[in-house]
Amino acid sequence: MSPIENSDSAAWRELEAVRAEAAALRRQLADSPDRTRELEARIDSLTIRNTKLMDTLKEARQQLVALREEVDRLGQPPSGYGILIGVYDDQTVDVFTSGRKMRLTCSPNIDTSTLSYGQTVRLNEALTVVEANEYDAVGEIGTLREILDDGRRALVVGHADEERVVWLAGPLAKVAEEDDLDDPDSPVRKLRPGDSLLVDTKAGFAFERIPKAEVEDLVLEEVPDVDYSDIGGLGRQIEQIRDAVELPFLHKDLFREYELRPPKGVLLYGPPGCGKTLIAKAVANSLAKKIAEARGEDAKEAKSFFLNIKGPELLNKFVGETERHIRIIFQRAREKASEGTPVIVFFDEMDSIFRTRGSGVSSDVETTVVPQLLSEIDGVEGLENVIVIGASNREDMIDPAILRPGRLDVKIKIERPDAESAQDIFSKYLTEDLPLHADDLAEFGGDKAACVRAMIERVVDRMYAESEDNRFLEVTYANGDKEVLYFKDFNSGAMIQNIVDRAKKYAIKSVLETGSPGLRIQHLYDSIVDEFSENEDLPNTTNPDDWARISGKKGERIVYIRTLVTGKNASASRAIDTESNTGQYL
């Protein structure tokens, strides 16, 4: 082949190669967008994986830090606690800890000016104060005897009557820095002898006052709203107690002029339900109003205090507790009386706690309780505005030393109401304001006053009639004599109120059943029958003579009782001699 042909052949080959390369470039150029998108997608995927790896690494690092902190926390030495008892300007404090008094350094993070005596503080292993906490909320209970002159310390009595002087912590201690200690909102001024305090005897601090229901429930301070006009059938007894109580308070100058000593106390005795407690409350109310009038003050703003002592609840199984409660009661009375306010200390069921010494069957508590009361009553001699009133239905069981002149000077018997007194009592509950039945009103020409008076007269005649239906008991005396007692012999103001309430309930039921409103005399008659029949089973006692004494029947000893009730639910008469159930007293 000629050189020219060879040259052409090489050129053609080179041209074909160029064409092939151009075609390849064209194909690559055509495929480049797809490749770019593929690479971008891969980059996005790698970015997401990288982000997840970074989050995982960060979380692992945080867990590692938390675990390291937990390891460090678990490896810390234990902290101690103490009670702050002193603060100094050089960032040091006195702390009572582990039974020792120590002077320690405070952490720079603690502002010592904000610390208070008695506050709990936390200590590190180097005994440095690193944290201030609250005051102790648990501890022993002590009884406040008195607050010392500096106002920051108090004398408290602990177990076994052990006396101890303690600091007043927290809000109690702040009062010492105040100028006006008579501020009624001051915590210390609210403290009074007999209060229970939370005490740490080792550190010597009292933290707060703890209300104890056992004492607060025994002494109920109140201003009674009972007036003499609310009491019926006891005009003579009210006059007696007004002479004994109100005259010495209202006319002190005359008593001093005649050298007459006011009575220290009054005993109200008589059967249950006859108004002894009502009279005592009315005395406190009336006395406050009279003194307010004498001072030129508004009678509506008159103040008096009626300390109602629940006799049986005063008893306590622990030795010395009952006597302590009695001391608290009279301390409270002296406190109130020192303000110039009349104070009535009323002991209800006095025979339950102040029995004749030596008469106890299972205990001899009265041998110490009675002398405690005697000393307190004698202590009232130099104290104004206080009088003791006792109430009992077994005055024969009260220790004679309490009843002697000079202690409970005045003794007033609250007897069961007679027919006239019963009418007076009924008039307190049956008034013209009550809705009366049209038929009963028509009998008196629509005169409500006349209708009410007639109702009262008829119901009293029914109650006090010595009829067969009103026979209650046949008693046999030790000498063999027998006597029939009627329901009128056991009537009381409480029974009269119950009869009227029963009649009102019958009137309400009558309205609901018949639609005819108003109280009728028949409702009262039905109430009397039901009241009498319910009392049939009440004189159940192992000792008929004791039951008779409580019920107000005195005289010859009773050895046998037989019921004679013939009401609508009664059957044959029933003898009562040695019943096992004591039952409720009339």
Curated annotation (Swiss-Prot):
SUPFAM superfamilies reported in the protein's UniProt record: P-loop containing nucleoside triphosphate hydrolases
Coiled coil: 11-76
Pfam hit, one: AAA
Domain statement: Consists of three main regions, an N-terminal coiled-coil domain that binds to protein Pup and functions as a docking station, an interdomain involved in ARC hexamerization, and a C-terminal ATPase domain of the AAA type.
Main function: ATPase which is responsible for recognizing, binding, unfolding and translocation of pupylated proteins into the bacterial 20S proteasome core particle. May be essential for opening the gate of the 20S proteasome via an interaction with its C-terminus, thereby allowing substrate entry and access to the site of proteolysis. Thus, the C-termini of the proteasomal ATPase may function like a 'key in a lock' to induce gate opening and therefore regulate proteolysis.
Family: Belongs to the AAA ATPase family.
Quaternary state and interactors: Homohexamer. Assembles into a hexameric ring structure that caps the 20S proteasome core. Strongly interacts with the prokaryotic ubiquitin-like protein Pup through a hydrophobic interface; the interacting region of ARC lies in its N-terminal coiled-coil domain. There is one Pup binding site per ARC hexamer ring. Upon ATP-binding, the C-terminus of ARC interacts with the alpha-rings of the proteasome core, possibly by binding to the intersubunit pockets.
Name recorded for this polypeptide: Proteasome-associated ATPase
Source organism: Nocardia farcinica (strain IFM 10152)
